[in-house]
Amino acid sequence: MARAKFERNKPHVNIGTIGHVDHGKTTLTAAITMTLAASGGAKARKYDDIDAAPEEKQRGITINTAHVEYETEQRHYAHVDCPGHADYVKNMITGAAQMDGAILVVSAADGPMPQTREHILLAKQVGVPSIVVFLNKADMVDDEELLELVELEVRELLSSYDFPGDDIPIVSGSALKALDFLTENPKTTRGENDWVDKIHALMDEVDAYIPTPERDIDKGLLDGLWEDVFSITGRGTVSTAGIERGKVKVGDTVELIGIKDTRTTTVTGAEMFQKTLEEGMAGDNVGLLLRGIQKNDVQRGMVIAKPKSITPHTKFEAEVYILKKEEGGRHTPFFKGYRPQFYVRTTDVTGTIDEFTADDGSTPEMVIPGDRINMTVQLICPIAIEQGMRFAIREGGRTVGAGVVAKILA
């Protein structure tokens, strides 16, 4: 079956929902698609369509990142519904790496919770530039003053992580009430239901507040490989990748870099949202068909790049902040030789911390939760890293630190 062509007629923006488990991220994602579907800007997606993997259903929590697309009058959006459960923050890091902005969902009934805090920190670390807040479950709060208190708390929390808390738009509503009404009245337009209007108001703020990103299309191609790799027998391997910069089209020669030896291959096909794509650009999430590459040659964390534009490395210096116990970090100090996981882009790689230096040049015996420190890291396998790249340090399923690559050593 011939695939429809992907039309690029509006600015394209990647956004996602972040926030604490059960605060309503997936319900809101479904409500947005149903609201915009009424005016032809989306294919309506039910909650169950978005929250689709079998293991998610049993536990009622989202594990992998679901991608949906929709349009407002202004822009075309790709939306990732990021996982909210603590075990899966790792996936949030891979989902959030591609976001130009995020909708932070906070339950008005509960206020900010531990994962709200962790997601804001991670959004800062992976470089999500703008956040708009949706105070969900407002139907469960009768007291207007209570709503204002929660709003104030959210603003203070955002400010504490260097987001402009005072300026960030906050819209309150109920994703579930909007979704229930739309399920019964799918053609509801603006002005016909208060709860649905709140979803329109949210998207107005997203349109206005989250800037259209300036894409790095003129730099050499760099695709971060993430999510799925699958084989189409006879044609090669399709790799899903988020294009960080540059552009890619069928026929381009590219290198597959990181984890294993560098391989050179040719792009023989490209698609996005199940439509064929003439040219992928920075900001797109694309499926690329690679000639002569087997499924087991490719894994998450590799990058696809213009030949000779980036090299894999195993040793670097980094500026790192180690989370305090109250922020969900370690309870105890660590010493030289500590071996956590380093999450770079979409890769988790074990590395050893060889040495550390404080701001004043001294070399402390140990690093205490809450310290900011310069450290030297030796990874167990090479990955494509560059100066200025951000990463998270994880241990036993939780984020214990966040940092930025200061200098490549080897």
UniProtKB/Swiss-Prot annotation:
Region (G2): 60-64
Region feature (G3): 81-84
Keywords associated with the record: Cytoplasm, Elongation factor, GTP-binding, Hydrolase, Magnesium, Metal-binding, Nucleotide-binding, Protein biosynthesis
Sequence segments annotated as region (G5): 174-176
Residues binding Mg(2+), per UniProt: T26
Single GO MF annotation: translation elongation factor activity
Family: Belongs to the TRAFAC class translation factor GTPase superfamily. Classic translation factor GTPase family. EF-Tu/EF-1A subfamily.
Protein name as catalogued: Elongation factor Tu
Organism: Arthrospira platensis
Highest classification ranks of the organism: Bacteria, Bacillati, Cyanobacteriota, Cyanophyceae, Oscillatoriophycideae
